Amino acid sequence: MDIRYPASLTQEADDGFLVQFLDFEEAFTEGDTLEEALFNAAEVLTLTLNARIDEGIPIPEPSVVPDLHSIAPSAKVQAALLVRRARADRPFADLARALDTSWPAAKRLEDPHHSPTLKQLERAAAALGKRLVLSFE
C-alpha cells in the first residue's frame, strides 16, 4: 500500500509555485522554489490528513495520476493510515487480541499523534496478514 497523493504544481507569475492536491480540495500551498513548494506540500498533506482523522472525515484512496507529483505525508500519518487500511472493517478487539494488548493500545496504532515502534508496526502487520516494508527516498 502506498500513501502518496497526487498534487499539481503550477509555476506562478512571480516565479513561485502553487501546489494543489487532486484528492483534497482543502489542501493547497505554495513555495518560492520547487523544493520549498514540495516541502510545504508534504506539510499541508500531513495537516489535512491529521485533521480528517481527528474529525472522522473519510480519507480517499490516492488517485493514480502519472503526470502529477506524488507527495507523502509524515511517517506517523503514513503508519496510522496503513494500519487503518489493513484493518479495514475488522474490530479493534480482534487486532488487540492478536497483538495480546488492550483495545486502547490497538486503537493508538491508527492515531497519527502517537508514535508506534517498529516492533509494534511489525506485529500489527503480521496480525493483519501483511508485512512491514520500509524505504528511504
Question: Model regions: which residues?
Answer:
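DNA-contacting interfaces and partner/effector-binding or oligomerization modules
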Residues: 1-49, 53-54
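Residues that mark the N-terminal boundary/hinge immediately upstream of a DNA-recognition element
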Residues: 33, 91-92, 117-120
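Short, charge-rich, low-complexity interaction segments located
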Residues: 53-61
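A short, Lys/Arg-rich alpha-helix, primarily the initiator
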Residues: 64-89
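Short alpha-helical DNA-recognition segment
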Residues: 89-108
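Central "turn" residue of the DNA-binding helix-turn-helix
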Residues: 100, 111-112, 129
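Alpha-helical DNA-recognition elements
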Residues: 108, 112, 123
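DNA major-groove recognition helix of helix-turn-helix/homeodomain DNA-binding modules
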Residues: 119-135
